[in-house]
């Protein structure tokens, strides 16, 4: 769910006007840019509820990794990510969570936006359930269960030239990227384990970046609780 960063400068040295050599118009990467989102998670019945919060993400500047030009961004929850932008597109190469003192290289690059922006472009990355939970077990979140810590999600560019309205404004010429994963869960209606879909939708707009995200995680039994998470851009600098 974290994808937008920072690259190169206006000269050989790092300056205040950093930007990537291969700028992606759907991924503004200049140091100092920030995005604030309203985050709303609607949990399914029984015991439905809605959790609301805000998330701010900021580009922190160039921070080379493994001898290659790399750019760091940080969320106000303390998570950090390192990205590159080159002929392959924009992709993540390392991350650090809020409780860790060190960053970790990704085993494989994690594509955010491919260089080839066509509907024929397909790619995959690993993911975890963001908020799907168990009602009567600890820890409740599926993302902490070994079986669900490395779920393959297949992505594609589903639509282009989209118009998106969020609290930050109305944006045109946007890109819709959709990810689909199958996770094996107990399905109460069939009294069996079954692969069920987990769906991710992201809208990226020119010169702005990510403006909206939706994540669907299924409720398949009374002792599970899924729903829909939505992130909408409320301001950017």
Regions found by a protein language model. Give the residues of each.
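Sec-dependent N-terminal signal peptides
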Residues: 6-9
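Conserved functional acidic sites
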Residues: 18-237
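Positively charged n-region of N-terminal signal peptides that target proteins for export
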Residues: 1-4
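C-terminal motif of bacterial Sec signal peptides marking the signal peptidase cleavage site
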Residues: 14-16
């Amino acid at each position: 769910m974290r994808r937008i960063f920072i690259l190169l400068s206006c000269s050989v040295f790092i300056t205040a006007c950093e930007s990537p050599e291969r700028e992606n118009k759907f991924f503004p990467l200049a140091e100092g840019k920030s995005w604030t989102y309203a985050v709303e998670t609607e949990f399914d019945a029984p015991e439905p509820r809605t959790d609301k919060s805000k998330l701010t993400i900021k580009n922190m500047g160039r921070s080379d990794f493994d001898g290659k030009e790399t750019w760091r961004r940080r969320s106000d929850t303390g998570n950090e990510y390192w990205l590159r932008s080159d002929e392959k597109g924009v992709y993540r190469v390392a991350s650090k969570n809020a409780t860790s003192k060190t960053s970790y290289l990704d085993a494989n690059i994690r594509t955010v936006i491919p260089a080839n922006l066509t509907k024929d472009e397909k790619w995959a990355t690993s993911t975890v359930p963001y908020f799907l939970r168990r009602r009567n077990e600890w820890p409740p979140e599926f993302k902490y269960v070994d079986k669900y810590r490395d779920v393959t999600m297949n992505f594609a560019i589903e639509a282009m030239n989209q118009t998106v309205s969020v609290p930050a404004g109305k944006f045109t010429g946007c890109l819709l990227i959709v990810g689909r994963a199958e996770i094996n869960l107990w399905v109460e209606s069939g009294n069996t384990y079954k692969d069920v879909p987990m769906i991710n939708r992201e809208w990226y707009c020119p010169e702005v970046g990510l403006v909206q995200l939706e994540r669907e995680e299924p409720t398949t039994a009374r002792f599970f609780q899924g729903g829909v998470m939505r992130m909408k851009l409320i301001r950017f600098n």
